[in-house]
Amino acid sequence: MIRSGDWVTARLDGVAYLEKPPLVYWMMACSYKVFGVHDWAARLPLALFCIGVCLLTAAFGIWAFGKRAGFYAGLVMSTCVGLYLFTRVLIPDVILTFTITLSMWALLRVLEEDEPNPRAWAFVLAASLGTGLLLKSLIAVVFPAAAGFLYLLATRQLFSARTWKRLHPFTGLAIILLISVPWHVLATLRNPPYFSLSMHSGPGEYHGFLWFFFINEQLLRFLNLRYPRDYNTVPRIWFWLFHLIWLFPWSVYLPAVGKLSFKPVDRAGRVRLLALCWIGFILVFFTFSTTQEYYSMPAYPAMALLLGSAMIAESSWIKWGTRVLTVVASLCAAAVITLLVLDRNVATPGDIFNALTSHPGAYTLSLGHMEDLTLQSFAYLRMPLLLAAIAFLIGAIGTFAAKPKRAFFAAALMMVVFFQGARVALVTFDPYLSSRPLAEAILHEPDGKLIIDRFYYTYSSVAFYTNKPLLMLNGDVLNLSYGASAPDAPKVFLHDEQLKDVWAQPERYYLVTSHTQLPRLEKLLGRDKLNVVAFSGGKYVFTNQFLPNSTLPPEVAGTNTPEPGRDPASANSVSDLRIATPSGVHPDAPKAALAKPQIQRQTRYSL
């Protein structure tokens, strides 16, 4: 957006990306304008709203139930697993959660008899809905509107003239339209055709912005008929049960919520009833739709409010919940310590990729990479496991026979330490999940054009950290397939036959690809034409021209023919291989070939 000056149509490598509204991208671009283009600047808006939603939940709880309950609601929100886990990736859901929470609070403030300024809160309600439309489109209005409808119906206020008078619906609608319509109109005008009612979504079809954004992305996605089918769905039962993990450790107190009063006879009862409508609609909605694990995040504040209200009651259910937490924390501590003992003598050559399996079919789910873990892989995670063991011991000891306040403090402290372990684990996974090491290696080599193989998102960090335009090999698929079909799509896509011509040119090219593509590329280009510049996390950087510190890729059975005069890099001569690093040549490649599917791992790229 900053480079092109086009703040209407989001683009990936110049290709129109019409799936999502632009507000989160505007925030990132503004952050870049202020702080410069850095990865932390991109994440800053998300981090601020993550803090903001915790503070907003606490303020909502204080208004509804008092200071202690509000504090506990904020504590639940800020230390639950779900909020931490699903804000490690840059998605707008936490900002959407903020706008929905604000709209729910504003609705109650509008309807409150002793509220001195209901008109202002009606405008806050409308503004939050309009802002949400620019974050994640229709669900930003559907969720709070449906929850509010159920609440008004349950409290017999739906057909009350007083209710609608205080809500100022016409002024509110004008505010919503004023905030959201200009971008939708501009996006439609800049991405024609303007109108289509086709209910078919398939490859090569292009119907403009309006059809794609509303019919393909909203209706057909809900009906599981959307193309491209680049998403998966969590089984319904697991979608519900996973909330025991997302709300951990506070989910042990959920049974205590059942003892609360939901009668709207006082402010606390009204908030609980609205929270119930709020949670219920979101969970039921996604029960009948395709869903990811994090889709229910907008319901977390409502769950936190109910838990905060239950935690001040200190009922017998709270005591039983604390006992359950003691047992769970003890079992987790024992499991983590067992892993540390089992892996105490396991070697950890290279990065964690060496010890992982591959389940690409699961990667469209947020936790898909968890299936890649093996017993050996935990040896690379010794420090995170140690911190996790300490965390669970804090939880087990701190909650044992503890009074509620002490137990809540111990649970919160447990999560703070656990999150530090999770952060260290993410650093360990960085070479596998990120391509930053490859980008840094490219920047230390002679200038050349950059090609990424297949999926843009797999190597998006290469584009970010090198700040170079890309050519995409077979990349007109998944999220880029629709933009690639546009009449004005940039010529940034290559296919295998074109790569053969490009690779033979005198101009230098770099190709970033996965180790799984070696057989295909060797058959297509020839092994002697693949000069390895870097390897990290199962990904290679090749160049079409020889570099003094480049090597040949490892042999792949049935595809290799040794180049005269160059070492064929067999398993017996692996010690002769040298892999380029950002600082020069790394002579310490491991001498043991580590087996991966179809490939013998013989070389390492290390920082």
Model-derived regions: residue spans:
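Membrane-integral, polyisoprenol-dependent glycosyltransferases
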Residues: 1-320, 339-343, 379
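Short hydrophobic alpha-helical segments enriched in small aliphatic residues
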Residues: 561, 587-589
